Amino acid sequence: IFFLFFGLSQITLSQEKKLNIIAIGAHPDDCDFKFGGTAALFAKMGHNVKFLSLTNGDAGHQSEGGGALGNRRRQEAINAGKALGIAEYQTLDNHDGELLPSLQVRHQVIRAIRKWNADIVLGHRPNDYHPDHRNAGKVVVDASYMVIVPNVCPDTPPLSKNPLFLYMEDNFTKPYPHEPDIVVSIDNIIELKIDGLHAHTSQMYEWLPWTNGGDEILAKIPTTINERRKWLSKRVKNRSNNIDSIKRISLVKWYGKDLAQKVKYIESFEVAEYGMQPSDKDIRSLFPMLKK
């Protein structure tokens, strides 16, 4: 009964204002890993969700590359977006492994946020193992104030108010660890998250396994679609089950003790110090699936 009620309460179309959410990652699949479940929840509730990859992913493979790989990854991203049910998955043509927080890329981000009329913007934290992740995080921070400045990118109308900017979760602790200000249960949507990641064939079943052990590990990856998805499902669920004591406190805050104790899979977000500084009431309005 709990899961039936919990699922219906999150998936029923919201009668409130439709929200515009844009998640900005460095590569096709970044947003899917860190926000895919919550994005699917927003989409199921009738809100407008866009994923934006700042690079085309044309370097992320052990045996393919260049334009052919970029085209492959763009199509994988489109397929992932369809699986998640989001409105749009856009991949820019900046080269993978070469992303810089340049003025040109900043302007791309400013225009994208404005054109989506974003209420919520998600990005990487600017401290990460991958230079593209770091620079993607920095360029979103650099754009955070400029989205309301009329004389910057005057070809796109400025936003009337600053959106809520959020950091997607990572495991790095220096200079400080991720702070789980908002923790969302994705129990009733985890299969859609897996479907979205499953669409990134070149990454889930080729490139990422290879980076963890080369051809020896790659040879152990299942070859049939069903076995691959089962293999991926186990890993995504393990990754989504990282509920430590701090995240549990946040879950209790947003869902109440009884519901929070039953949550198995989550995604976690940190409120950035830039842009809108929300009250708890604001967060519940912007994350309607959190309402008790």
Feature map (PLM): residue ranges:
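Active-site rim/loop-helix segments in enzyme catalytic domains that contact anionic ligands
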Residues: 13-116, 138, 146, 156-157
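Conserved acidic residues
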Residues: 87, 119, 163
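Bacterial Sec-dependent N-terminal signal peptides
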Residues: 1-16
